[in-house]
Amino acid sequence: MNDNNKIIRSMVLYLLIFIAIYAMVQLYSQSTEPITDIDYGQLIKYIDANQVKSITLVGNDVKGVLKNGTEFKSRVPDVTNFMSFVNPYILQGKLDFKSEPQVGPPWWVQMLPSLFLIVIFIIFWYIFMQQAQGGGGSKVMSFGKSRARMITDKDKRVTFNDVAGADEEKEELQEIVEFLKYPKKFLELGARIPKGVLLVGPPGTGKTLLAKAVAGEAGVPFFSISGSDFVEMFVGVGAARVRDLFDQAKKNAPCIVFIDEIDAVGRQRGAGLGGGHDEREQTLNQLLVEMDGFSVNEGIIVIAATNRPDILDPALLRPGRFDRHITVGIPDIKGREEILKIHSRNKPLAPDVSLQVLARRTPGFTGADLENLMNEAALLAARRGLKQITMAELEEAITRVIAGPEKRSRIMSEKDKKLVAYHEAGHAVVAKLLPNTPPVHEVTIIPRGRAGGYTMLLPEEDKYYMSKSEMMDEIVHLLGGRVAESLVLNDISTGAQNDIERATNIARKMVTEYGMSERLGPMTFGTKSEEVFLGRDLGRTRNYSEEVAAEIDREIKRIIEEAYKRAESLLKENIDKLHRVAKALIEKEKLNGEEFEKVFNGEDIEGVQFA
């Protein structure tokens, strides 16, 4: 970048010098003597009054001297008429006349404007080329140079000690480390180490971190590049960059080449429709050739990461290229505790902080979520002027990560406050009464994010499957807010829009994907289609009749109506509990899990006066 700035500064300096020379030439080419400029009519009057001593005609321009010694110049519109007028004066000797051929400026002065335009064009072309390359490279034509960043031992090393919650994944990758450290042990047994390792998993699970840890453990050079860095607006650039990347890797073997977000370049090749795909496909073809082209034990291992394995080209996934696929999943409770330990190393924690409790309260959190959680807690503690992070900040950070920051400044009318209170109380009371829902962790009518209020349920353990009864209870819980509005306020609001949408989606999946409908049986309705324009972007197409479609709609409607009636029955039987929770929310605005349990069981809590 500094080299680019130097080049641009030099070009600007030369341009300024060029402009200065051009201006000096223009000034030099003009006469510096003061000459009076008169119009054509005044010139005729002077000649007629015999006040002109001499004139010189150069083209249409007239220069002359008056009898009082004043020099002048003028422009003649019609030379023929002018000569007809002055001829008598010349013949009578009253006027000295001289005619000179018109002489233009030197040829090199005439070329200066054209040269100026050429220089301007070259500068703009250079800037355009630099931008087309994304600013990379110090040479105009360095399109084909790889943008991979090489990390060596001099940089801060990441090891497996910095990775937690992925024990099985580390075991799989340990073989790669062993091969890079002690290749002879494998070669003597005729083993072929995988050429490529594909790390698959949701965003934030630590795929990039694992790749860095492999390089750090093996102590070999690590080339890091994003899939999007290959593709440019010019066809052929991506393929050239792939070649250059592997040329660099061969020079530094044994090494690791890490391609992050490989789906940007490795997307399924289409049928040639839609346009705009040639550059990406050429890049992918070159990548396929390079991965299957270098010799078997050259010591180059390609690690790639993606969260969209479904759209990758099959040729990329076959044995011999990415022949080892490692799924990096969401950590379990033990993994979350280990991750929290890593991210709390440099943070002073208060004695009341229990990372085990935090791990239990964060099911579904990825490693990135947990890092963000610890950072949010540290920011909250700093904002409150604390020297240590307490459990209160961590609890608040969990809620911030899940639902967003509180919006206490938003002013709500009493009517809206009552509506939100009964809506959230309906969710909480129904969740408490259902056998298959997690315990209530927090209920609030303080807006967070895009929600006017929320009821947070926190599972006590990780769940990987859901039964039919659990899904039905989830739908009942989602409809609890709408039912409470209808029962108490005799009106319904738009606040249940997201609840109804989620409930309908669950019911539709129960019928069309999970085969949980007794009437339709264990069948899947609708097939996943592979859109040729988008490169295997998943959609659903109907493979059933209109009659079956109507039956699906009836089944979804039946499930929703049954859940609605069940929620209505539960709230009618426990209407006093609903009123107590709503009153507590109106007065206190927020109830934690312990306070909710007390209110639900008829006990008093601080800050709320029950009649």
Curated annotation (Swiss-Prot):
Q: Which domain of life is it from?
A: Bacteria
Cofactor, how bound (note): Binds 1 zinc ion per subunit.
Q: What's the cofactor?
A: Zn(2+)
One Pfam family this sequence matches: Peptidase_M41
Catalytic EC class: hydrolase
What are the binding positions for ATP in this chain? 124-131
The UniProt annotation places Zn(2+) binding at 423, 427, 499
| Originating gene | ftsH1
Record bears the keyword Membrane: yes
| Cytoplasmic side stretches | 1-6, 129-611
Task: Give compartment(s).
Answer: Cell membrane
A GO CC annotation given for this chain: plasma membrane
GO molecular function annotation: ATP binding; ATP hydrolysis activity; ATP-dependent peptidase activity; metalloendopeptidase activity; zinc ion binding
Give the bilayer topology. Multi-pass membrane protein
InterPro entries assigned to the protein according to its UniProt record, in alphabetical order: AAA+_ATPase, AAA_lid_3, ATPase_AAA_core, ATPase_AAA_CS, FtsH, P-loop_NTPase, Pept_M41_FtsH_extracell, Peptidase_M41
Q: State the family it belongs to.
A: In the central section; belongs to the AAA ATPase family. In the C-terminal section; belongs to the peptidase M41 family.
Keywords, A to Z, come to:
ATP-binding, Cell membrane, Hydrolase, Membrane, Metal-binding, Metalloprotease, Nucleotide-binding, Protease, Transmembrane, Transmembrane helix, Zinc
Protein's recorded name:
ATP-dependent zinc metalloprotease FtsH 1
Q: What is its EC number?
A: 3.4.24.-
Please name the PROSITE patterns in this protein's record: AAA
What ranges does the Extracellular topological domain annotation cover? 28-107
